[in-house]
Amino acid sequence: MLIAVEGIDQSGKKTQTELLVKKLKEKGINATKMSFPDYETPVGQLIKRILSNEIQVPIEVKHMLYSANKWELKPKIEELIEQKYTIVFDRYYQSNWAYGLANNLSIDWLENLDRDLPHTNLTIVLDLPPKISLKRKEQNRDIHEQDLEYLLRVRKGFIKLASENKWVIVDGNQPVDTVHDLIWKIVSERLKHNLQ
């Protein structure tokens, strides 16, 4: 099973991804986490330089690189699927779509970039007002995390895509344990359904 935990910057994706993997393991399920962008790969290192404003590229190139970062790791993802792992993604192709829409790119073009990547069985969007995102991390923000108007557009993109793609929206503006319990309820129901 492939699960993506999505949302704008500082919505709690990393924390909730880690809690979900821990819970899955406690239930005897082989589970692992993958995060994107993955800054350890050659493309990931280039993305890091772009996000820190060290180098500038056209917006289309940036989104092609986000996709290429996943393609670099496609063999690893497929290997984990083959080994029957449940993979929980802290961002996956869904982020590229939502951020791309915020940059006025075509959803068809964005989807084509990721068309042959392994697709998720479940996508959970942690919804958070951008003003709260900005309060959660006030220092060392990347170029996207600093722009309130941009984050508002990204949030709008996630909500639109969620309704079109049957993604599940969870209110991320709650205590960590409450959000985790809501996510676990959704995931455990999906796991039961998959076993039937």
Language-model features: where?
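NTP-dependent small-molecule kinase module
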Residues: 21, 131-196
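ATP-dependent small-molecule kinase phosphotransfer cores
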Residues: 29-115
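Walker A/P-loop
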Residues: 14
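Hydrophobic anchor at the beta1->P-loop junction of P-loop NTPases
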Residues: 5
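ATP-binding Walker
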Residues: 11
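P-loop (Walker A) phosphate-binding loop of NTP-binding proteins
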Residues: 8
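A glycine- and Lys/Arg-enriched "phosphate-lid" helix/loop adjacent to the NTP-binding pocket
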Residues: 96-156
